Amino acid sequence: MIDYGKAGLAVIGMGWIGEYMVPCYERLLGNGYESRILAVKATDRRLEELRKRYGFEIMAGDCLERLKALRPAFLVLSVRPYEMAGVVEGTVKPYIGFLRNQGAPMPLIISFAPSPRPEWYTQVLGEDVRTVCVLPAMETSIGGVDVYSLASSQVTYDQGIPLAEGHREAVGRFLEPLGKVLWCTPEESMALLSMNITYHMLYLLCFALEGHYGAGGCARAAGILYALNCGRLGRPGLVKPVAEPEEADKRQLAWLEKGWYEGAFDFAAGHGRLPDGAPSSNVRVLAPQAFELHLLSLQLESRQFLEEKLKDHATPGGMTEKAVKEFKRLWEEVQGGAHGCRIPLKGSGSMAYDISYRLAEQVYQRGISLERG
């Protein structure tokens, strides 16, 4: 059993994700958690600011000797995917070797990089080390509205190496501030992520529709799609649309809502099957929540804020950047190569479905290529 009141935790990578997860560190370790945390940054930028803000030890540079002294029960890795191999080979592997020579217990490693896969950590660190890879829920509040009930984090691990006793409980406790925990196979997690990123492109759909509706048109388009989706799926919805859509507006965009939702959903359901071939129940949990969350953002946040948010997510070479490029290309393709992305007010559900499905597929393939390096 893990004694959370005495356990330590180290965070390698105190950037955006490292800071975002601070409530999770507190929930996991409990009272007095500040005295049992070590956070590590690559440089000393903002070092003093972060120390004053959080009140726990934060250092810059090589942390191997501090890890040996602290011997944390939990080791959180929140560096960028392209940095992960260097951190694991240069710091984590030597630390694990030290523990092994000492006959000391191994930490549970929690990685926040979407790649590499959990099996890679097993190959590099050994079968006595357990690693979980987490795609955390990124929002529990939007525009002042509590969306905790819609938030879900995806967790994967090496399916060939069962988690040790207490690890599932520890992960659930750790992620509790961020909503539900969905345990997935690596393949399923990638398919669900591809679906979610495709739903993220609702931003671009509503941006493109803004011209049809005038001032506030982006939020209005999102409100119409939101009302359609909640009504079709029989969900109450967290908030009323910005303006209650007229029936004519709903008829105008019904094809787009249904096709966009079902295309990415069917891709994830088909590519996220369990090892026995059965469809995963996680897709039915995540899809309506993700669709609603993105449409809520469009109704409750400014377009400028959302454009910056999308830009931040679309890191060079990543899956979201791929989605943005393919979104524009696929719409231009169905419009006969017309320059620019114009979303028609009239269309067919099959057209929206086809673009959504193909977009999820392209994003998925980018994710697989990133996993393979």
Can you say where each PLM-predicted feature lies in the sequence?
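A charged, well-structured terminal subsegment
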Residues: 161-185, 311, 319-327
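Active-site loop-to-helix "anion-binding N-cap" substructures in soluble metabolic enzymes
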Residues: 204
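Small-residue helix-packing motif on alpha-helices
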Residues: 37, 47, 67, 84, ...
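NAD(P)-dependent Rossmann-like dehydrogenase/reductase catalytic/cofactor-binding core
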Residues: 1-7, 227-373
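NAD(P)+-binding Rossmann beta1-loop-alpha1 motif at the extreme N-terminus of oxidoreductases
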Residues: 1-74, 174-177, 211-217, 270-276
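Rossmann-like NAD(P)(H) cofactor-binding subdomain of soluble oxidoreductases
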Residues: 21, 54, 58-170
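Structured catalytic cores of enzymes that bind and process phosphorylated ligands/cofactors
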Residues: 14, 189-192, 314
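Conserved Rossmann-fold dehydrogenase catalytic segment
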Residues: 140-141, 176-201, 214-257, 279, ...
